[in-house]
């Protein structure tokens, strides 16, 4: 409904002119309106339909003239909705008469302004319009053409499919001249926007329609209004004329002037929802279908049925034979139809060439004579049998639709080709001497011939895509040229004769606004515009020639060689898009590849080869490996390798497709074998075909060209063809698999419907008042239904012979057992049995049906059979049948709307009982109950995959089964009127449908009469000749029941299958059989007929073959089968040809009661069951003496139940005699969910020996088992629950896997998973025994997961992966940030205990509590202070980019302030990022939380305020420890062999004493650190392995000055690295902005200021070993450093006094070892 409202609410594109006709709003031309982009954009959208197709194909020349005249004047209307242009409207003075306004005012009670009224006609639109705008008009043009060719063509034919007597003759002519492309502008459902002509009678309805609506919707009307209503109707006939709107396909109503005052009335359109009217068939379209003399299904077909000439029929018959009957499917399908009994299995081989003629005859009947399939199958057998049976005829009917569609599309594409040819001719003839450009390909007769030879949709698409490749760019130009020529023609012609109009109308379809080039272009267009066509042509073969080589499998066309090297030639084509010869060649190869890939012949050959050779490879996804177990439908094809698609069976590929859609499998379809080694002869398809585009010469030039050609071929295959062909093949395989499912569903319904009504025993018929008028004709059935719910009553419904419910019964305790343990239950059961007995004796049903709900149904059946037997013995009731009936249909009916309406007061289970009774009475009628507009029939379970086929296809197939069967059985119209329950069959009668069928019944009801003869269908029901011919033979009249109730002549043949067209022959046969004299005056053929019906054996003497020859001689055609059919009918009128009812067999009962099928319940299946008890074998008397004595305990053991606590042997005997010995335990009794009982023998309980099963399982326990054996008669199964059987490593029980199953890939994946599991299970730590509330034996990930729910500052202590003498303390810095601190243990008693002393770096702790209190808690407190600071920001866990963006944004907002923020760093837990932006670029430094406070720039601050106060005072100071340098700065690496033991302190002291006086305090502290002064014993330890995170520490026994591997652009350490802490000593004065770059070297002498190659700056240095003994001469280093400072100062004297530069914290600074952009001192000071 929402779609309906939205489409109705869209803005109209039309206006009304002064005659009330709809006129399209004229859009201004693109070229004229270029100054107004917004309006232009609006026009672009207005000129597209909802699919983006241009509306330039619509005939509105005359309207445009009007529009152009109107452009100058404006009627002064108010503007339309926002965003739309002001509409220029003519003023209409006579739009509504004063009488009309009076009427409106009277109804509304207010004055109405008597201005102009404008009607809106809906405009279909789509959200896609905006998107398509940017693609440019060329794309829209292509889409429009594609729409023309490939959308459904119903529109064009839809107008002719329904006769429209009210349309004036000139409209019919206009319709023929309709735009061919307009027919393809379709709505979302694929239906043409142009509504067929039957959308007409909008305002008025007959009173019959209202009455019908009232019956359907249960609404009372004021019947007094009906007279007014009739007047109104008559008036409407005068008031309105109906016209087709050519522009939008809308029907509009043109009011004519009238003086008669209309009566106010609400139409049914106002009273009911459109969807309700549609589902009840009350719309105008439905009225038109009822009125039109064509079979209803002909009118409803999406592609209408059109008459055809003999030539076309021959061509079509041949095409249908080849495609539908002679071409085998790609996959293995059981193509044998279920009607082909005893025929070969493949339908394409059984149909010989003689079938073509039969198909042609069938098509002639369908298309030219409008006969429906059942009519042809029953009354034109001579023309179609034996080759075509009824299902084959349906197939012909379906393929006729496909043929018509293909033909129309071919015609449309041909017109397009002709237009393009004409356009090309005009272009060339304008300058005939000019040579053709490289990019132009002439559209010649071979292209037209190729289109003419197209035989399938695939080929048509190939031709169309080929056309688009070469001419797609010219389509807009062609349209604009056509438009210009039309304008010119219009100026020349003033009136124009008919011939001119015809030409104009033909051109009109391509009208449209001037088109611009597409704004976005594809790669091919770019290559084309760069002029690479010329180079592409020099590859040596045209695509057509290559295609012919490929088709003929030899080099029919030699490859031509261009006399120049490809690269040399490419230089001539170098341009801005393709700047190098290599790029040019790449572009040319792309063009050649695409041309080859679009060549129809190449595609045709490859398509055929691909389908023959295609291999299927399947691998499971990660989800699939986990989810697809042996119970899954995809288990057998979880891994497939090189399975030929030709070996796929039935619906297998649909399952594969479903598994792919669910993300379980990945499918790969390829033409070559995958992963097969050792097959040297198996060359790929590419290697096979490249020789056809190859020149066999050895010169370098030829080889270079060959290389280009080979690359082009490879690209054509890999990039275009293989992908498209695989997709195409996949869709075909899916279609075949779906068709297989649809066929299986049809077959199941066929088997249900083929069952005849139940017939009681002959004896019962004779004994009973079987034809008793009071009870109704037919058999009486008692249906018994019950629910699986506990203590739910049983309901019985008695149905008479006409299907009407005459009585019912409620039995509240009938499901209880007769042998129930409780006496009360037994008594109640007995009462119900007595009640049922009395009911059976009184009502005397012929059969009792019981619902097959579950296993209880067996018990009920036995009870009822016992009751019937007892009554039979007492001679109170003849022996009647008791049948178990599948209740699936009954449950569906019980829940349907129809049953609720029919039996509103009945409880659901009673409704189910009614359906059960009716089903056995006549399955056809009962199944038809659920085949309604609600599509309830799809709720029946036909096939496990029925939900995955196209719903419409499945419904059509099921409807066909109903149509076949109903027409075979015939429909008694009078019975349908008398008993509405059987009305559902009428719609399936040949020629009728839901609309015509109900209309027929309605007429008979209105006339309050029965149908007394078939001729009344014409005389009284006004049926047209075509519909009458189709349906007459299938509507039967019970002439016997009419009897004396009518005076009219009764035609006895009306009760037979004999068609009225052959009544004369039937009479002739009767007269001839009785040897009457036809010429006698008193000859009475009707009397002869009645006599023959009584003595049909007289007909056997007739020579029907001679009669048939005589008829053929008289021009009636071949009728010999018809004559034999007439004889059969006269022998037994409307004999039921269905299979007699039979009781279900054992297997059917098992499946019915368990709701299982062989696919769901089979040997080897894994199931779950509940233990119900232990099974024992009773002891035999002779075995008593075998009691065993236990020598150790002296006690005796029972040899059966193994009880071993008897002190004396006599007690064992007493144990036997008293019956307390249960016997030997032989197994376990279980119950499955489906009601089947299971038994597990003792030896299958376990792989170990089990003597006492009760020790292994308990009653009520759930156990996993595998089925070993199924006994369907006893509803039992033998099970095993041995581990070895459940695992089934040898695949003894599991379902067999596919022949092409890839066991190797499965084993490899399995091994990989096992390795992963082992890896995960392997603990990375030693479990410890430590008593502390914060200690947990968990790993790193588990600790972090626990931390998620803990508070900030909380601690977890856990084992360390470093070994048994380490622990890790993890504490929560903030949400998602956790610091892990390494703790070293010393003085351990054993590996699992806690060490006597604990060390973090060089700091000693006595126990874990001290670490928490003195180390972690202070840091947590300091961290909390920062987290609560007003300038704290989260920045996604310390994301530098986010922080920089925040600073830049804040700086922009407040340029005069220096913004600063702090955030926790996730990469380095325990550190915080301090970001600030004094000027243009943001700067970021680190603040580290330590137990003493905050460390920032080498200083410790005990409070946050102190930290930020100092920061604000010193933010401009240079960062200590950083050498200012260019962005390419690096650090000199530390000497590999340095060790703190070898520092020359004397030299260093001398050097330090000689330092200049102006050194900063930071410099001194840095130098002091070299001598080991000022060490902070409480430095934050490197709690991870130092090499992992890139900052060192002296903990953990590691070297105190490792050079760690760091991220890219990591500066390497300088030679002046300190022994204890990993930070860098500056090598130049920090205050000086001018500096040299240090050469990264291991020697301290390399100080040349040379730019460093980037590769060296990324070198990773080896970690120095702590046992290295080579010394570093620190004194020399310090001297050298002083010398450099002196030199630097001398340079500075020549310049101005240097200003302190801002901190060199710039973005481009290389990454420090800690991972930040600036190597900061506090990073090193760990």
Swiss-Prot record:
Q: Please give the organism.
A: Mus musculus
Q: What is this protein called?
A: Transcription elongation factor SPT6
Could you give a single Gene Ontology term from the biological process aspect?
transcription elongation by RNA polymerase II
Return the SMART domains for the record: S1 (SM00316), SH2 (SM00252), YqgFc (SM00732)
Q: Can the keyword Coiled coil be found in this entry's annotation?
A: yes
Give the coiled coil ranges: 3-51
Q: Which UniProt keywords apply?
A: Acetylation, Chaperone, Coiled coil, mRNA processing, mRNA splicing, mRNA transport, Nucleus, Phosphoprotein, Transcription, Transport
Q: Provide the function of this protein.
A: Histone H3-H4 chaperone that plays a key role in the regulation of transcription elongation and mRNA processing. Enhances the transcription elongation by RNA polymerase II (RNAPII) and is also required for the efficient activation of transcriptional elongation by the HIV-1 nuclear transcriptional activator, Tat. Besides chaperoning histones in transcription, acts to transport and splice mRNA by forming a complex with IWS1 and the C-terminal domain (CTD) of the RNAPII subunit RPB1 (POLR2A).
Q: What is the lineage of its organism?
A: Eukaryota, Metazoa, Chordata, Craniata, Vertebrata
Region of interest (Interaction with IWS1), ranges: 2-485
- Locate the S1 motif domain: which residues? 1213-1282
